[in-house]
């Protein structure tokens, strides 16, 4: 498993313990006490590092090459998943996957950004950066879900919508704007979960819902830290400073009222234990459906509208501005 920059002390100690255990197996010497001391030291070190993660550390975890994707969670959370393809206008975008499935026996529509696990798949899925046809495919599935009264679950994980020439020619901004408009008025429950990076309008194209949740080490922002640093300081190397200033973590966004709940992650990140992470997401989805149960269509839309109207409201007090 690939190590991150801040994890090097932990990895080095783990390797030392493993080497000592291997040596003990192949010799008559007993190092059990030394191993016990090192394992205790490892536990304290992990608690210190993972319990005090900086914003940039969380950015690295959110971008981890082995971080679970939408299809990983679909495999663990849903049954009878049937993927649907194409937007019926141009083509099929592999950067967004979606289809119908069953959640605890209940028919649902599942949609999400999809990154690749290796170079070949990343190229096929455009590194999880959708074209307009991806957002139009997602909208087609949402309207289908509305027609058949199926709840919608969206998984958000993208650096952003693809900014290439062809994407712009096919109406990238219109496709995202159309999704925002249509999602706001859907008459079925919509649950959105940020599972990795939530980047700019590319994330918002799947991000209008009744409840917005984030995994503990995911990020959600209007631009990447590197992009913000390049614009503000003409230096992408100041990405760490930008990340600190942008308030992009789950804890920051919950405090600001942008998201509803934070879903805990395994120590070190979701990639450490996909099954356990799926169970944590499952608990949150179940809890959210319980909260949405019994709400009429009109009330659903009204509450969703009120939710977004509150975001960004400010009050002036003693010349200070506070985000509600």
Curated annotation (Swiss-Prot):
PROSITE patterns: COA_CT_CTER
Annotated EC: 2.1.3.15
Location in or out of the cell: Cytoplasm
Coiled coil (residue ranges): none
Keyword ATP-binding: yes
Keywords, alphabetical: ATP-binding, Cytoplasm, Fatty acid biosynthesis, Fatty acid metabolism, Lipid biosynthesis, Lipid metabolism, Nucleotide-binding, Transferase
Lipid biosynthesis in keyword set: yes
Pfam families: ACCA (PF03255)
Protein task: Component of the acetyl coenzyme A carboxylase (ACC) complex. First, biotin carboxylase catalyzes the carboxylation of biotin on its carrier protein (BCCP) and then the CO(2) group is transferred by the carboxyltransferase to acetyl-CoA to form malonyl-CoA.
HAMAP family registered for this protein in UniProt: AcetylCoA_CT_alpha (MF_00823)
PANTHER family: ACETYL-COENZYME A CARBOXYLASE CARBOXYL TRANSFERASE SUBUNIT ALPHA, ACETYL-COENZYME A CARBOXYLASE CARBOXYL TRANSFERASE SUBUNIT ALPHA, CHLOROPLASTIC
Similarity field: Belongs to the AccA family.
Record protein name field: Acetyl-coenzyme A carboxylase carboxyl transferase subunit alpha
The organism of origin for this protein: Bacillus cereus (strain B4264)
Lineage of producing organism: Bacteria, Bacillati, Bacillota, Bacilli, Bacillales
Originating gene: accA
């Amino acid at each position: 498993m690939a190590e991150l920059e801040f994890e090097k002390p932990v990895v080095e100690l783990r390797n030392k313990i493993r080497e000592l255990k291997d040596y003990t197996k192949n010799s008559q010497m007993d190092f059990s006490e030394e191993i016990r001391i090192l394992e205790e030291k490892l536990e304290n070190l992990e608690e210190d590092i993972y319990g005090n993660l900086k914003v940039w550390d969380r950015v690295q975890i959110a971008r981890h090459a082995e971080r679970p994707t939408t299809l990983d969670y679909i495999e663990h959370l849903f049954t009878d998943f049937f993927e649907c393809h194409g937007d019926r206008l141009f083509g099929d975008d592999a950067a967004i996957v979606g289809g119908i499935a069953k959640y605890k026996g209940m028919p649902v529509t599942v949609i999400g950004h999809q990154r690749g696990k290796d170079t070949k798949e990343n190229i096929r899925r455009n590194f999880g950066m959708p074209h307009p046809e991806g957002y139009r495919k997602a909208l087609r599935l949402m309207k289908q879900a509305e027609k058949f009264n199926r709840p919608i679950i969206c998984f958000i994980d993208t650096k952003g919508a693809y900014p290439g020439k062809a994407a712009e020619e096919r109406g990238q901004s219109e496709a995202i704007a159309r999704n925002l408009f249509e999602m706001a008025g859907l008459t079925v429950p919509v649950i959105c979960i940020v599972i990795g990076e939530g980047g700019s309008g590319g994330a918002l194209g799947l991000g209008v819902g009744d409840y917005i949740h984030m995994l503990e080490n995911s990020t959600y922002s209007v631009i990447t830290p590197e992009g913000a640093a390049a614009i503000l300081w003409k230096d992408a190397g100041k990405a760490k400073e930008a990340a600190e200033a942008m308030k992009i973590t789950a804890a920051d966004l919950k405090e600001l009222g942008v998201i509803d709940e934070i879903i805990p992650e395994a120590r070190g990140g979701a990639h450490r234990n996909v099954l356990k992470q799926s169970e944590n997401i499952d608990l949150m989805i179940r809890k959210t459906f319980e909260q949405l149960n019994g709400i009429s269509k009109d009330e659903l839309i009204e509450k969703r509208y009120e939710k977004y109207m509150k975001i960004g409201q400010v009050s002036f007090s003693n010349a200070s501005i506070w985000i509600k």
